[in-house]
Amino acid sequence: MTLQELVHKAASCYMDRVAVCFDECNNQLPVYYTYKTVVNAASELSNFLLLHCDFQGIREIGLYCQPGIDLPSWILGILQVPAAYVPIEPDSPPSLSTHFMKKCNLKYILVEKKQINKFKSFHETLLNYDTFTVEHNDLVLFRLHWKNTEVNLMLNDGKEKYEKEKIKSISSEHVNEEKAEEHMDLRLKHCLAYVLHTSGTTGIPKIVRVPHKCIVPNIQHFRVLFDITQEDVLFLASPLTFDPSVVEIFLALSSGASLLIVPTSVKLLPSKLASVLFSHHRVTVLQATPTLLRRFGSQLIKSTVLSATTSLRVLALGGEAFPSLTVLRSWRGEGNKTQIFNVYGITEVSSWATIYRIPEKTLNSTLKCELPVQLGFPLLGTVVEVRDTNGFTIQEGSGQVFLGGRNRVCFLDDEVTVPLGTMRATGDFVTVKDGEIFFLGRKDSQIKRHGKRLNIELVQQVAEELQQVESCAVTWYNQEKLILFMVSKDASVKEYIFKELQKYLPSHAVPDELVLIDSLPFTSHGKIDVSELNKIYLNYINLKSENKLSGKEDLWEKLQYLWKSTLNLPEDLLRVPDESLFLNSGGDSLKSIRLLSEIEKLVGTSVPGLLEIILSSSILEIYNHILQTVVPDEDVTFRKSCATKRKLSDINQEEASGTSLHQKAIMTFTCHNEINAFVVLSRGSQILSLNSTRFLTKLGHCSSACPSDSVSQTNIQNLKGLNSPVLIGKSKDPSCVAKVSEEGKPAIGTQKMELHVRWRSDTGKCVDASPLVVIPTFDKSSTTVYIGSHSHRMKAVDFYSGKVKWEQILGDRIESSACVSKCGNFIVVGCYNGLVYVLKSNSGEKYWMFTTEDAVKSSATMDPTTGLIYIGSHDQHAYALDIYRKKCVWKSKCGGTVFSSPCLNLIPHHLYFATLGGLLLAVNPATGNVIWKHSCGKPLFSSPQCCSQYICIGCVDGNLLCFTHFGEQVWQFSTSGPIFSSPCTSPSEQKIFFGSHDCFIYCCNMKGHLQWKFETTSRVYATPFAFHNYNGSNEMLLAAASTDGKVWILESQSGQLQSVYELPGEVFSSPVVLESMLIIGCRDNYVYCLDLLGGNQK
């Protein structure tokens, strides 16, 4: 049975059914072909090829095209000759394609007419002046000419000696000697189906010739396992050069089902692709790599791909390590019934070898499972063996996987005959437990990157062959970045070397970064010291200075340069046209990520939403998007920035119902309230600016992470004073650990500080709440501190003098910290009596009270885009309040008491709550619907803290946990005591500070690695505050408090003690610092303002 016979059998039953659909996703109607049309077109192509091709020896025909409606007909037409099809990817590096075609000794190639110019320009050396060409519909047939052919597989029957040598070499791969007399021969007329090459990154690229007998059992078995019928719609997710594409195409066309094809560029746009697959075409079967699925983002996966109403019956994930069960469960919407499979295989035994269906019971279980998903059972005709280092098959323990089967054999490189039952080494290591096989990882330095195997030594070899590189080494930094370290006499060749690597390496093997170093570090054994290289890279990213832009014109010129260098465009291209699109100019997903990285390095900050803009918009639109973030106009551009970013955060349009409500809310307060301009400081270094664009532009505090009127919802910058911009401190010595001496004396710092009481204000009882400092933009002298107490009092105190401006008695104790409204006219605070109070900020007069069903100790958070107030309650609910309309917009059950404070992230627009039941929840700020949740297993008193990439939170089990904004846990850092302290990030978002009940203050980097820790004299409950030394230096400091009443001032880079001051009572309040003054509450009933005096201020 051959692939084409499978299709003809199905076509005979379903002639008039749709076989193929091609949707360009450009607002034009999709194109459909019936089985009858596909078969007829294939027959015409077969006749054409038989007429014009003079086959001698092995029949192989290249196919150089992009995905389209005719693709299945073209493949089928080649197979019917009969011949094997050899896919050539037009976007692959020309040198790689040429090597592949030459090694195959490819004589004929069909080129899509749309790709003719690209083919001729990239491969002109293969075409003589008398090159034979002939056209057939949308194809052109070329006859290729090879000079000095290294490998010639057009063997005749007389080369027996050669064959015997091949048999001998193959038998060394542990072939059963009893079967040595039985072989598969690729010269047989109907033997081969297709020819591929391995990525070439696990060594020299291997040619893999796949017989029909090897691939057909895959198709037949999957049809049964997936229960494919004529009603199914399958998506062609894989490129032709990746062998799972064969399964996708022929699984559909051998079953009477329909195959959906879209342009490659659409696959790079997650929201658009999800809409096309599951809304427009109702795809029922999807085979994909985990990376492809992850591109959708957990929110879109849960709401669309794996929702309760999804069309998707079957999801088969393979090509990479299978996601953890925890992640998989977080992706599934409630009520989803999609069958999920783990498939595993290698190209050398094309295509898949094993399969495992994740049981519904396992998917629905709430029990935490740390075990990986098993590889499952062998597919039809496949033999799976696990062998130890001695080559013996094992039934228990760890070893390398070998794959094969009597007919499941392929021809590698210049093999002509292969013994049946040949077993191929995979390079994958597994463990066998109770008969089940679990994946461990790749052999030696082989890794999988972007779904493809990569041997990092190959990258080193290619780089070392470049004349400008004296020596080099490659590391897989933190298993996420490929870094090339180079020693070169010429420091200016970095860009040139990067271009050269792009020429000779496939895209997934191109390094993320090139780092120039003076010499390679070695171990005592004379080997490259990888750990030292990692330290060099850590210092490199911490210490590299920001690029400074001189203005808009400079940005445009540098963007043009990055565009040309990333796309490898000619240097003599004077100007990139304004309307140029990245994907149409030769870009792909990896290059887009590279361009994003280079732009963010150029501007010195992250640019939210930029990747989607790069993939879908012109260079001019990309420029404008960057401009709105990094070179904001004082008025107009900033407002544009707000609108643009808000639109990006709503890209999946899930908040449609909430949008009109928010608009009404904003209109209401705009009409009835005076809008003030001010800056707000609160615990954890949080800085928020509202309605004060002109003021902030002057300060240099424009942020990329927030809307136009928000400098930072999440620790973007700290104010040194209201007259000068902030400088960011970075750690130079990650291994430094500082602590108090046995006598309790502070360690010697570069410049000691002293703390003195400037003023204190009596509240009548303990102050556990943290201060809120509001700085009016146009009257800095009227800066006010708002804070509540267990005495039921809410106070407004003058920041500079400590004079009480007003005092309001509420109904019960106040532990909640205050929050300001968007207009600045109101202060919002929670109370033990279950009420949320809205007080007028200028008088303390009660404006509105909202009732919950239990105590409110949570502190409110305000959404600067809508003005909504979010707060949690001990009644186990989260609330969204419109204080202007005096109504509750939504109420969401959280599954546990909400003690900590919510955290709002703007892009993606998520609101985070944590419960004493151990749940961390991400909810939709517009509706209150849960987007994802994670059970930490222990109570969460700590408040979540957002930065541009991650969300961090402390747990009473002693761990600081870090998650992506899509709910995937990235890392956890363990301390020796419960964590009640909320984390605080540095202005650069490269470090995170927090305290623990083990009496230490910790500083970690964003990879979860300890930078330093400082031992205090008691437990640390409060949240630290990072700030700039007011003495005129560039020093970044950290203020923290321990429960015994000590206030600690540390140098943030190393954790070195600068000063300590002991208050007369316990401290559970968190400090806030402005200029040289620190505000904090104490259990001696007072709010304190401490003056921080440096050596030159005493």
Curated annotation (Swiss-Prot):
Modified residues (Phosphoserine): S649, S724
Keywords linked to the UniProt accession: ATP-binding, Fatty acid metabolism, Ligase, Lipid metabolism, Nucleotide-binding, Phosphopantetheine, Phosphoprotein
O-(pantetheine 4'-phosphoryl)serine PTM positions: S589
Residue intervals of the Carrier domain: 553-630
MF terms (GO), sorted A to Z: acid-thiol ligase activity; ATP binding
UniProt EC number: 6.2.1.-
Tissue: Ubiquitously expressed in adult tissues.
Residues reported to bind ATP: T198, S199, G200, T201, T202, G203, I204, P205, K206, D428, R442, K527
Class of the enzyme per the UniProt entry, highest EC level: ligase
Pfam families, sorted: AMP-binding, Beta-prop_ACSF4, PP-binding
An individual GO BP term: beta-alanine metabolic process
Membrane in keyword set: no
Family indicated by similarity: Belongs to the ATP-dependent AMP-binding enzyme family.
Role description: Covalently binds beta-alanine in an ATP-dependent manner to form a thioester bond with its phosphopantetheine group and transfers it to an, as yet, unknown acceptor. May be required for a post-translational protein modification or for post-transcriptional modification of an RNA.
Protein name as catalogued: Beta-alanine-activating enzyme
Source organism: Homo sapiens (Human)
Gene it is expressed from: AASDH
